[in-house]
């Protein structure tokens, strides 16, 4: 039997995933982090993107989109806290495309600095959601 690690993914609204995994890949600020059981303790921030979970005895990885957040790793436990998170199967491509279009439109008005920064953050989240949808559907 393969070694496993317990994984909890929690958003402000609810718990999205709680179970064991053989491996987790998370979107760190400086690149993707691959985490296996007995990993060295770690605390870092996450950027918007998809968390991939390889559960024992399953061929397919489970995908959870996170809008950013905090990742804590202990040798036998991974905890991800995110403002918002969505299971990959529940992502809405049309909604993500509309959010991307709206953010790009808002970024055209560079006069409002605060709105521009907000639009940049929204654009990053929309692009990350679309990338998660693409991974889920295994599109090139």
Swiss-Prot record:
It comes from the Bacteria. GO terms for cellular component: plasma membrane; proton-transporting ATP synthase complex. One of its GO terms (molecular function) is proton-transporting ATP synthase activity, rotational mechanism. Pfam families: ATP-synt_DE, ATP-synt_DE_N. CDD domains: F1-ATPase_delta. SUPFAM superfamilies: Epsilon subunit of F1F0-ATP synthase C-terminal domain, Epsilon subunit of F1F0-ATP synthase N-terminal domain. It is found in: Cell inner membrane. The keyword Transport applies. Its main location: membrane. It is a peripheral membrane protein. PANTHER family: ATP SYNTHASE DELTA/EPSILON CHAIN (PTHR13822), ATP SYNTHASE EPSILON CHAIN, CHLOROPLASTIC (PTHR13822:SF10). Produces ATP from ADP in the presence of a proton gradient across the membrane. HAMAP family: ATP_synth_epsil_bac (MF_00530). Belongs to the ATPase epsilon chain family. This is ATP synthase epsilon chain 2.
């Amino acid at each position: 039997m393969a070694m496993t690690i317990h994984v909890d993914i929690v958003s402000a609204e609810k718990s999205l995933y709680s179970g064991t995994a053989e491996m987790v890949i998370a979107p760190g600020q400086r690149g993707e982090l691959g985490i296996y059981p007995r990993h060295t303790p770690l605390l870092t921030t996450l950027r918007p993107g998809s968390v991939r979970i390889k559960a024992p005895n399953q061929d397919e990885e489970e995908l959870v989109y996170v809008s950013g957040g905090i990742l804590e790793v202990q040798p036998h436990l991974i905890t991800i806290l995110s403002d918002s998170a969505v299971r990959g199967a529940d992502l809405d491509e049309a909604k993500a495309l509309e959010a991307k279009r709206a953010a790009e439109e808002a970024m055209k008005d560079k006069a409002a600095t605060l709105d521009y920064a907000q639009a940049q953050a929204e654009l990053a989240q929309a692009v990350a959601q679309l990338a998660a949808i693409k991974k889920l559907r295994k599109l090139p």
